[in-house]
A protein has these predicted regions:
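Post-cleavage N-terminal segment of exported redox proteins
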Residues: 1-46, 157-167
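Solvent-exposed helix-loop boundary motif
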Residues: 20-44, 48, 52-150
Length: 167
């Protein structure tokens, strides 16, 4: 009887195909629902004192939205960790259209549900995939991480609901 050897590469392919691990479950795309009784008009939420520091801490990495001199992800600057953030510039960028869904502004003052920013932060941007460039609205933000805690997102939501002022 003649024995044949299999190449190590083929052995790895066969072993990988025979493992019992199942592929990761697909991410569910569900609409964010604001908890009943949530007051978006109180307490007052200011952009410079509450929202900008949150963006700098959560989004202001140089590889994401934190480098004022370089092209940032989605072309959006949200303040850098190693600089004094330009709040006026940050707000101006938030009032522009999304690069993934150009028909939708990032922020609609007074209406948090109508802007793309809260969709990305809440993780329900995937409901808009058919309208986005390339038929995908990309990842939730922050990218490759869990969603920000609901109470952190509520700060941004309140600021938008209260008019998205530069205060």
């Amino acid at each position: 009887m003649k024995l044949r050897t299999i190449s190590p590469a083929l052995a790895l392919v066969v072993a990988a195909a025979c493992t019992s691990e199942s592929p990761p479950a697909p991410v569910k795309c569900e609409a964010f629902v604001l908890p009943a009784g949530t007051d978006l008009l109180a307490p007052p939420t200011t952009f410079r004192a509450a929202v900008v520091p949150l963006f700098v801490q959560s989004c202001g990495f140089s590889s994401c939205h934190g480098n004022a001199l370089a092209r940032n992800a989605a072309g959006l600057y949200l303040g850098g960790k190693d600089e004094v953030p330009d709040a006026t510039r940050i707000r101006k960028g938030l009032l522009e259209a999304s690069t993934e869904l150009t028909s939708m502004p990032l922020v609609v003052p007074g209406e948090p549900t109508k802007g793309y920013l809260m969709r990305k932060l809440d993780g329900d941007h995937c409901l808009l995939d058919a309208s986005c460039e390339g038929k995908s609205c990309g990842q939730a933000m922050p990218r490759d991480n869990e969603l920000l805690p609901a109470e952190v997102r509520l700060v941004v939501r309140r600021w938008i609901a209260q008019g998205a002022k530069d205060d």
